[in-house]
């Protein structure tokens, strides 16, 4: 029974969670800290010193020798600097282990070395990390030993947010304030807090480490830049929910254990649609904790893969021709006393509070569809969105038959009198029980779908932080809640006013609702007719961040300033250009050093074969060798010409000013040139001797794991 895991015993064992604080902190200190966590009360340095001491003692017992402020700058990954607990040696040469409240609360990383979009110059280096006590500290064990990781926010010396966490916490305050106002209108006086609750489904690929090491494109960019499809892809639908291979099962087992120890509620695991693709989904958590947990999960997925002789690929589109990877963001609003504001109940037409919340969200998504689209903008997502594998790049809302029918009743007659219910599903097999179907089907093609008691935003890229999309969701919902509350609080007749408001929102924003097939080519034309924003690429979407509408929205809730929004737009433009530049240079490097030499060797062998056969007898047939030689030589020339053109465009890009101008040039000129280079190379792979091809094929990568 060596493989037995006592989940209850190991869960959260490396987390300084509430139960640990209750056990270790003096009662007064614990109560004060809980007030800070739950009510935002300022934490005194006296209390911080006590918390820091107990946190240090607990961490040392867990094997920690260092601590770090663990934060999420605008690089897309987490950052940390390790400091040991040791102090300067005393006269006898011995050291003490120390960790103060000041060290817990504040750190000073170099702000100029992280992306700031112009907010920090190289000579303006000071930045601050500050403890986020709402997200528990944890001890991470790796080759460096035990590290006490303290979740923190990161800001500049002048106070601008330079991370993902700070605006997320601000947006949580905004939605909490406005949602509580809404609840009070309906007579709820007991709920004290409304928190966005999120579960993020994480998709990923696994490939063999030795094969990964032979692919410079995977090493440098996270995705394959060349590669012909094997005879079989995902068309048999036999990988999705299929039996998990033993090697992958062993990997998943260790991933689960690592997640559980750090308090991450890894719940559901399965094979995804594409070969070598998988998914891991946690249970819901408050959105700031869910965002931290997702970062922890991605690190664990990568770390454990290495131990098992594999590499975990989190890129949105590591392989052309098969599905890419996303991160479905399941978002709901819950109170501290267990009420889900997105729970329709059995009779949604009678649930006025739910209908108001629902129509407010419809209005929010319709008015800020461009911002929601931008929140999922990523250079890798450009390769994924819009294919028959992921939502289209057009924001729409799926409600399903039941809620659509209720809204149509409201719009057409002014009154909703009934709700559709699920019917009994008769399987036709006596030994199988009959059961009630759901009142509506699911729509996997919708980017923003209502799924029972939550909204599922399916656009987010697999390697991206979930913070950005949730900042947008929280803030746009808060804006419409505020507008609704302003009107309803001033109304003389609440019942009439709320009824009229629900009908108004449903009527004016029904264009955002689409329950059809988002993959259908007709949908884009229909979306254009409806006036919905169509933003196919990251570069198209970024301007949504800095419109007057967006600035007014975010500044009104103190989520972002104009300067912060402009800096983030600049960072995204730069990030796009740098990513494409690296990919383009990698393609040229691989073509120059690996592919062209390999094809030259192959054509030489063919030429020698032709000459050798003809030397025996001029009458012998060499048409096969000749045909292959002609085709490979033609494709080789096309490859060289395409490579030269791409090299020239890479050099030309340097002349374009950093920011939007350079990003647009990469999208409009460099990306098409990259595709032009890939085409002849992939054709060559199909005819060149496999033993001579310089890198593992798609078949090797996705079927031999």
Give short role names for the model-derived ranges:
Residues 1-7, 704-705:
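Basic/polar N-terminal segments that are highly enriched at the extreme N-terminus
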Residues 505-705:
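C-terminal amphipathic alpha-helical interaction region
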């Amino acid at each position: 029974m060596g493989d037995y895991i006592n989940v209850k015993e190991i869960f959260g064992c490396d987390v300084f969670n509430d139960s640990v604080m209750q056990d270790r902190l003096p009662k007064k200190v614990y109560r004060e800290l809980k007030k800070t966590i739950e009510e935002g009360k300022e934490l005194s340095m006296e209390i911080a010193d006590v918390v820091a001491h107990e946190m240090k003692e607990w961490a040392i017992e867990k094997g920690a020798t260092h601590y770090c402020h663990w934060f999420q700058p605008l690089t897309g990954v987490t950052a940390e600097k390790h400091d040991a607990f040791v102090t300067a040696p005393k006269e006898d040469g011995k050291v003490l282990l120390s960790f103060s409240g000041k060290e817990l609360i504040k750190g000073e990383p170099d702000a100029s070395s992280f992306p700031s979009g112009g907010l920090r110059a190289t000579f303006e280096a000071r930045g601050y990390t500050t403890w986020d006590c709402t997200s528990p500290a944890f001890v991470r064990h790796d080759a460096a030993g035990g590290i006490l990781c303290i979740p923190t926010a990161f800001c500049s010396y002048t106070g601008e947010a330079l991370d993902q966490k700070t605006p997320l916490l601000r947006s949580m305050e905004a939605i909490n304030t406005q949602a509580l106002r809404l609840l009070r209108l309906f007579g709820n006086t007991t709920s004290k807090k409304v928190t966005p609750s999120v579960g993020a489904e994480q998709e990923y690929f696994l490939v063999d480490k030795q094969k990964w090491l032979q692919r410079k494109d995977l090493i440098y960019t996270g995705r394959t830049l060349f590669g012909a499809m094997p005879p079989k892809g995902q068309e048999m639908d036999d990988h999705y929910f299929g039996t998990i291979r033993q090697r992958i099962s062993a990997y998943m087992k260790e991933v689960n254990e690592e997640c559980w120890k750090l308090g991450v509620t890894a719940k559901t695991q399965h094979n995804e649609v594409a070969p070598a693709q998988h998914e891991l989904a946690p249970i819901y958590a408050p959105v700031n904790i869910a965002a931290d947990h997702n970062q922890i999960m991605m690190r664990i997925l990568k770390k454990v893969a290495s131990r098992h002789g594999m590499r975990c690929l989190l890129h949105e589109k590591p392989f052309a021709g098969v599905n890419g990877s996303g991160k479905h963001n399941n978002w709901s609003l819950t109170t501290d006393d267990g009420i889900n504001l997105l729970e329709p109940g059995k009779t949604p037409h009678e649930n006025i509070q739910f209908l108001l919340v629902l129509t407010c969200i419809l209005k929010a998504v319709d008015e800020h569809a461009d911002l929601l689209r931008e929140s999922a903008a990523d250079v890798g997502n450009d390769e994924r969105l819009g294919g028959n594998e992921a939502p289209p790049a057009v924001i729409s809302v799926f409600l399903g038959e039941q809620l659509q029918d209720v809204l149509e009743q409201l719009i057409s007659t002014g009154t909703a009198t009934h709700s559709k219910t699920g019917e009994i599903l008769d399987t036709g097999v006596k030994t199988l029980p009959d059961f009630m179907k759901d009142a509506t089907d699911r729509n996997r093609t919708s980017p923003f779908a209502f799924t029972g008691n939550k909204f599922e935003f399916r656009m987010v890229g697999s390697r991206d932080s979930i913070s950005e999309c949730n900042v947008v969701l929280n803030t746009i919902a808060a804006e419409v809640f505020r507008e609704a509350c302003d009107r309803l609080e001033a109304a003389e007749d609440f019942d009439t006013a709320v009824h009229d408001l629900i009908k108004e929102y449903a009527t004016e924003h029904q264009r955002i609702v689409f329950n059809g097939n988002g993959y259908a080519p007709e949908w884009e034309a229909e979306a254009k007719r409806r006036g919905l924003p169509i933003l196919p690429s990251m570069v198209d979407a970024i301007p949504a961040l800095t419109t007057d509408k967006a600035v007014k929205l975010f500044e009104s809730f103190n989520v972002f300033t104009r300067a912060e929004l402009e800096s983030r737009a600049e960072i995204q433009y730069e990030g796009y250009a740098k990513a494409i530049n690296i990919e383009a240079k990698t393609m040229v490097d691989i073509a120059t050093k690996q592919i062209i030499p390999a094809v030259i060797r192959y054509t030489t062998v063919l030429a020698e074969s032709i000459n050798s056969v003809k030397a025996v007898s001029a009458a012998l047939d060499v048409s096969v060798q000749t045909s292959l030689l002609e085709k490979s030589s033609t494709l080789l020339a096309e490859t060289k010409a395409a490579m030269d053109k791409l090299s020239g465009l890479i050099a030309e890009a340097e002349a374009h000013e950093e920011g939007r101008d350079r990003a647009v040039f990469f999208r409009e000129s460099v990306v098409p040139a990259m595709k032009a280079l890939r085409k002849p190379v992939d054709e060559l792979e199909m005819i060149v001797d496999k033993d001579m091809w310089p890198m593992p094929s798609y078949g090797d990568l996705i079927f031999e794991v």
